[in-house]
């Protein structure tokens, strides 16, 4: 088993590590070596409260400038997203322009091998991909 610090030596263009902040005692080391930290958030007050400890940890590692908050599972025709955006202002963290909607296509994607048949879902993923790649360049 290698060390976390060896990750940057791996021959990959992209490496995604998906973990809830409370499950990894290695999170500070992972944050230190990350080129970009993506924090998904739903439009809920509980998620807004839960994100604070993650952002505090990222700030303690001086990586807030390499952090991007991405809204996920956004409900249509609600003001919740605006409320959460206002709540996030105090954290002084970059928020992705692309929001991922709560579309049935995303839920079904595991069963049908993607979202190719839903142009709206595909457009959201394409836009988010471009935004992430731009943040890395």
Regions found by a protein language model. Name each.
Residues 22-44:
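Inter-motif core of Ras-like GTPase G domains
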Residues 49-72:
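Conserved C-terminal guanine-recognition region of P-loop GTPase G domains, centered on the G4
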Residues 108-132:
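C-terminal boundary of histidine-terminating zinc-finger modules
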Residues 43-45, 72-77, 116:
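Short histidine/acidic/glycine/proline-rich micro-motifs that form metal-
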Residues 1-16, 21, 110-114:
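P-loop/Walker-type NTP enzyme "switch/lid" segment
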Residues 75, 86-113:
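Beta-strand-loop-alpha "switch" segments that mediate conformational coupling across diverse proteins
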């Amino acid at each position: 088993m290698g060390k976390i610090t060896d990750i940057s030596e791996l021959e990959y263009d992209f490496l995604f590590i998906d973990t809830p902040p409370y499950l990894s005692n290695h999170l500070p080391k992972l944050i230190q070596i990350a080129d970009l930290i993506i924090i998904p958030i739903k439009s809920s007050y509980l998620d807004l409260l839960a994100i604070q400890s993650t952002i505090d940890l990222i700030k303690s590692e001086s990586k807030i400038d390499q952090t991007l908050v991405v809204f996920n599972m956004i409900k249509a025709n609600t003001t919740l997203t605006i409320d959460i955006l206002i709540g996030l202002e105090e954290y002084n963290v970059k928020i992705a322009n692309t929001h991922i909607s709560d579309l049935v296509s995303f839920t079904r994607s595991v069963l049908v091998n993607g979202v190719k048949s839903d142009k709206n879902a595909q457009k959201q993923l394409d836009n988010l991909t471009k935004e992430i790649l731009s943040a890395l360049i």
